[in-house]
Amino acid sequence: MTITQPDLSVFETVESEVRSYCRGWPTVFDRAVGSRMYDEDGHEYLDFFAGAGSLNYGHNNAVLKRALIDYLERDGVTHGLDMSTTAKRRFLETFQNTILRPRDLPYKVMFPGPTGTNAVESALKLARKVKGRESIVSFTNAFHGMSLGSLAVTGNAFKRAGAGIPLVHGTPMPFDNYFDGTVEDFIWFERLLEDQGSGLNKPAAVIVETVQGEGGINVARAEWLRALADLCERQDMLLIVDDIQMGCGRTGAFFSFEEAGITPDIVTVSKSISGYGMPMALTLFKPELDVWEPGEHNGTFRGNNPAFVTATATLEAYWADGSAMEKQTRKRGEQVEQHMIAITEENLADVKEYRGRGLVWGLEFHDKDRAGRVAKRAFELGLLIETSGPESEVVKLLPALTITPDELDEGMKTLARAVRETA
């Protein structure tokens, strides 16, 4: 693909230096549909990024767009804080009947604010309020958001440094396979909890991702998650699952923890919950934990009614028929894995490991700079992918769940070419 030099002057002179994704994809995007994006010069890109997991159902999904347009054309409420609205009522009823009841999940639903970090902050506040303790345990290579409370339970040194102040009341523990299987699961964590001389303040909660997306696509085993849930119960700690990126079907089931057969005390959901890429977040928790006072946690944009509309349409279109979406995602994941095997076999000396679940996959190289070169070459070839991991050493794939088998093959072949051409 030949890409003419776009006019980026206004972005470079007016927009802050903090911008990041646009540096890896130096073009000006204009429109998008399904798994395709187009820049202002008409160049086409296959999207294996999906808004960092916010577009599980593709760009401008026709079913969701129609529901949104109809709502706006009848002058439906757009901004409602936490007022009761018809859009919110329909979402809550649909979410309860389509997602919660079939899974026997009794959760109360809280709208904490428009983003994932709002959900995490509210989860941490609630856990501390319920247990009367300050400390939260997180895991190595975790990522939970960019506000101060979320950063305190995030592992990435670069992102933590941006806080500019000490990040306290968070203690990291080794994630699954952090020691490459040489140390028994939770032996360190459990010893610290039981030893009165360890210096570890008893935690109010433990927060975990079942698959660490920003941390490098580190996949926790189901048995590890079950053991963690058991440890939390025995030690009187709440279990918080951050399902912001891995929920909404990304790993197969609607909630990523379903495979492990656990029921977390608190769950954070965002990104693709609106289905259309609009800001929306949920904090779910067991009814006995609902000890909030009215207005104790709030936010101006927590009642994004257009997002409620598209979220409802998403649940009705993709999750009302039981396990069809889950089965499709698992099948697409098997398709990706076959390509990953082929790429690995072709580049045995270069590829350290591939790993993933459902439609989230990572490809790690021995050369930590290789992933960035692969992503750059992929962009030049018309494929949008990002990197993850503490040193951006992993190529990260997040295609839309609605991607077709042919598009998936096309993207994986482009990835294979990018790997080959950056050797």
Swiss-Prot record:
Annotated Gene Ontology MF terms? diaminobutyrate-2-oxoglutarate transaminase activity; diaminobutyrate-pyruvate transaminase activity; pyridoxal phosphate binding; transaminase activity
BP GO terms, sorted:
ectoine biosynthetic process
Report keywords, A-Z. Answer: Aminotransferase, Pyridoxal phosphate, Transferase
* Pathway(s) per entry: Amine and polyamine biosynthesis; ectoine biosynthesis; L-ectoine from L-aspartate 4-semialdehyde: step 1/3
What InterPro entries does the database record attribute to this sequence? Aminotrans_3, Aminotrans_3_PPA_site, Dat, Ectoine_EctB, PyrdxlP-dep_Trfase, PyrdxlP-dep_Trfase_major, PyrdxlP-dep_Trfase_small
Q: Which Pfam families match?
A: Aminotran_3
Cofactor(s) it depends on: pyridoxal 5'-phosphate
The answer on whether this UniProt entry bears the keyword Transferase reads yes
| Transferase keyword on record | yes
Q: What is its EC number?
A: 2.6.1.76
Q: Which residues form a coiled coil?
A: none
Q: Which residues cross the membrane?
A: none
Query: Which residues are modified to N6-(pyridoxal phosphate)lysine?
Result: 271
The UniProt entry's sequence similarity note says: Belongs to the class-III pyridoxal-phosphate-dependent aminotransferase family.
The name this protein carries in UniProt is Diaminobutyrate--2-oxoglutarate transaminase
Species name: Streptomyces coelicolor (strain ATCC BAA-471 / A3(2) / M145)
Gene of this entry: ectB
